[in-house]
Amino acid sequence: MSRYWSPVVGTLSPYVPGEQPKLPDLIKLNTNENPYGPSPKALQAIAAAAGDTLRLYPDPASDDLRGAIAAAVGVQADQVFVGNGSDEVLAHVFMALFRHGRPVRFPDISYSFYPVYCGLYEIPYQVVPLTDDFRIDPADYQPGGQAAGGIIFPNPNAPTGRALARDEVERIVTANPDTVVVVDEAYVDFGAESVAPLVDRHDNLLVVQTLSKSRSLAGLRVGFALGSRALIDGLERVKNSFNSYPIDRLASAGAQAAMQDQAYFDRTRQAVMATRERMSADLRALGFDVLPSAANFVFARHPEHDAAQLAARLRERSILVRHFRQARIDQFLRITVGTDAQCEALIGALKKIFSS
């Protein structure tokens, strides 16, 4: 601790990202990256943008990118906010929309960046327990007395992978008209229903998505939010008080091309979903309890094997999976859906571990 720190810094518990080791022949199933790579058209667009214009600042409004996103998801361009990854978008959300002096509500088992943002911005929060079978119950988000300072949850939830139907999300939004409800749809393209079509109907709904997962652009850091013009204007005001140029020229070019290449997007996400179902069946055949997943990962536990030890033994075999040392889920592993060959290697390694 430094005597030069601001007082809040010493109270922070920063987010811990998944490890990114530089090891040869590693099967990396721990950070939910897409195994199929970006659209070739996105790579071509990035290469084409890597020219003399890099000496110039990018468009601070990211108009072309916002237009491409709007066209892809069916909203107007002025209903789109873009940021340097959905984590930055979420950071702006907490600053712009959640600092009301009232607790923000989110699930007890959810994206671990939410309490980090609350600590950073000194926002009170209240965790809402998932059900015994790890579902978000819309009834638990009915207002009781004073309106919440905000509501946020992933759909599908992370790390569980379970998803709410669109009408269930709308129940939460409708029940909280005086509260901004943020739906974090990082994994929505792998089998869940997006609530983006509802933003015209509900001015308190904000939808956040990313190009890191289904568009295979985690290395570019591009995320976006969809919502009413008033919510988007609030995010823009915070962004322009922090960094007016969050999206660089290369990221913008690649993201636009990725959003426009619908055929590649559909083909690769369908491949991920098909592999997920095969891997889930294979894990169940080995005795794992596997939660239903609408994401590009599965959440599984084995009744006879400790999760932390399994993760360690898989690592010895150059296979990385994610283990969380958190109450209620410390016996689960979150396993990213890789290629068929990677998932077959995982199953083979588990069979050897169980037989040894």
Curated annotation (Swiss-Prot):
Pathway: Amino-acid biosynthesis; L-histidine biosynthesis; L-histidine from 5-phospho-alpha-D-ribose 1-diphosphate: step 7/9. Its EC number is 2.6.1.9. It catalyses: L-histidinol phosphate + 2-oxoglutarate = 3-(imidazol-4-yl)-2-oxopropyl phosphate + L-glutamate. The keyword Amino-acid biosynthesis applies. The modification N6-(pyridoxal phosphate)lysine is found at residue 213. Coiled coil: none annotated. GO terms for molecular function: histidinol-phosphate transaminase activity; pyridoxal phosphate binding. One of its GO terms (biological process) is L-histidine biosynthetic process. CDD domains: AAT_like. Keywords: Amino-acid biosynthesis, Aminotransferase, Histidine biosynthesis, Pyridoxal phosphate, Transferase. Its cofactor is pyridoxal 5'-phosphate. It is an enzyme of class 2 (transferase). Belongs to the class-II pyridoxal-phosphate-dependent aminotransferase family. Histidinol-phosphate aminotransferase subfamily. NCBIfam families: hisC. Homodimer. This is Histidinol-phosphate aminotransferase 1.
